[in-house]
Amino acid sequence: MRYDVVVVGSGVAGPIVARNVAKAGFSVLLVDKKPAIGAPKQCAEGLTINAFKQFDIPYDKRFINREIYGAKIYSPSGYTAELRYKEVSGVILERKVFDKMLAYYAAKAGAEVLARTEVVDVIRREGKIVGVKAKHEGEPMEIEAKVIVAADGVESTIARKAGIDTYAPPHEFDSGYEYEMIIEGFDPDLIHLFFGNEVAPRGYVWVFPKDEDRANVGIGINSDNEKTAKYYLDKWLKENNIPRNKILEVNVGLIPVGGFVKELVKENVLVVGDAARQVNPIHGGGMAEAMKASTIASKWIIKALEEENLELLKNYKEEWWKTEGPRMEKLLRLRRAMEKLTDEDLDVFVQLVSGTDLEKIAGGNYIEVVKALMKHPKVLMSRRRLEILKALL
């Protein structure tokens, strides 16, 4: 089997690369090791509304559970800050359908798609990578390709086999645990985020409504914690008198929140999405970031193939670090500052920020917010709080 491009992994990043490159007229094979693309999910399923237009994805009700109008955050002592829009700001997806439809769009654009196909190694000839070794339904196969895209998730095999350093220590990951469950008492038009060092160490609890009385209720905590994410989530449910006897689905996963893969390209191999740890360090969301990275990668793959010059692939790394890197590094600095906050600090800051401030913070445009906070008496009276905020400027 021989293709211009083989894409390993059919989550979010992989199908977008496959679709874009196939649309340009090149032969593409998209493979995924799972028997059913999209399952199991490892995601809270929230996506900004802007992504559909920005990345040319149909707004299809088949994979949209609920439209969302904003967010509400809760401090350890119950103080809240709310951001609410008049228009839809995001959606809660059905990832099992969404991911499969992304693969469908790639197939309709001309890509070939093979589920239950696990890539186990690269093929090298005369020191160069010329393809991948895989197993399709247990049968060995070799796939030759000019370009290989590693979009196979946080535990990427193919990037490692290609010699790309994707290692990160355990403390740079969060451990996630989530129930899809029946739950009542939360405004279903908003996502809800609960912070606190006793609630979710180094993370938060989320309630992402999928219906009036059904939601993804999950947690992310530092993966090197002596207690499990499940322990903290069950504790939060019990403390809030939320029965856990109507659980429809359980999902677990690792969330890379401590930094990004530096070497995004090596020879003819590109790494995108969770495999490159291209995840927003503040909220741990990776779908929109994967879409951005895969769009940039697609552009340079197409140019490299059109001009028959694979050296152009390096421009993916350069462009991502130039356009997305600075924002992501700022968010990483913010995350590291937030990890130093006590519950008392969290109470203070949640009382001081507005909904507009929350929007700026989540997008990495937090300098003005930080400067305003530094002038407030509750911050000025604490040298430690001032030092934490100064480090962000």
Curated annotation (Swiss-Prot):
Question: In the UniProt record, does the keyword Flavoprotein occur?
Answer: yes
Q: Which GO terms describe its cellular component?
A: membrane
Q: Give the EC number.
A: 1.3.-.-
Q: Which cofactor does it need?
A: FAD
> What molecular function does GO assign, one term?
geranylgeranyl reductase activity
Report the coiled-coil segments: none
Q: Keywords assigned by UniProt?
A: FAD, Flavoprotein, Lipid biosynthesis, Lipid metabolism, Oxidoreductase, Phospholipid biosynthesis, Phospholipid metabolism
Q: Which reaction does it catalyse?
A: a 2,3-bis-O-phytanyl-sn-glycerol 1-phospholipid + 8 A = a 2,3-bis-O-(geranylgeranyl)-sn-glycerol 1-phospholipid + 8 AH2; 2,3-bis-O-(phytanyl)-sn-glycerol 1-phosphate + 8 A = 2,3-bis-O-(geranylgeranyl)-sn-glycerol 1-phosphate + 8 AH2; CDP-2,3-bis-O-(geranylgeranyl)-sn-glycerol + 8 AH2 = CDP-2,3-bis-O-(phytanyl)-sn-glycerol + 8 A; archaetidylserine + 8 AH2 = 2,3-bis-O-phytanyl-sn-glycero-3-phospho-L-serine + 8 A
Q: Where is the signal peptide?
A: none
Cofactor stoichiometry and binding remark:
Binds 1 FAD per subunit.
Q: Which residues does the annotation say bind FAD?
A: 13, 32, 43-44, 46, 95, 119, 274, 286
InterPro entries recorded: DGGGPL_reductase, FAD/NAD-bd_sf, Geranylgeranyl_Rdtase_fam, Geranylgeranyl_reductase, GGR_cat
Q: Which GO terms of type biological process are on file?
A: glycerophospholipid biosynthetic process; membrane lipid biosynthetic process
Which residues of the sequence carry a binding annotation for a 2,3-bis-O-(geranylgeranyl)-sn-glycerol 1-phospholipid? 327, 363
One family from Pfam that matches here is: FAD_oxidored
Q: Which class of enzymes does this protein belong to? A: oxidoreductase
What's this chain's function?
Is involved in the reduction of 2,3-digeranylgeranylglycerophospholipids (unsaturated archaeols) into 2,3-diphytanylglycerophospholipids (saturated archaeols) in the biosynthesis of archaeal membrane lipids. Catalyzes the formation of archaetidic acid (2,3-di-O-phytanyl-sn-glyceryl phosphate) from 2,3-di-O-geranylgeranylglyceryl phosphate (DGGGP) via the hydrogenation of each double bond of the isoprenoid chains.
Remarks, miscellaneous: Reduction reaction proceeds via syn addition of hydrogen for double bonds.
Which PANTHER family did the record assign? DIGERANYLGERANYLGLYCEROPHOSPHOLIPID REDUCTASE, GERANYLGERANYL DIPHOSPHATE REDUCTASE
Record family assignment: Belongs to the geranylgeranyl reductase family. DGGGPL reductase subfamily.
This chain belongs to the protein called Digeranylgeranylglycerophospholipid reductase
Instruction: Report the source organism.
Output: Pyrococcus horikoshii (strain ATCC 700860 / DSM 12428 / JCM 9974 / NBRC 100139 / OT-3)
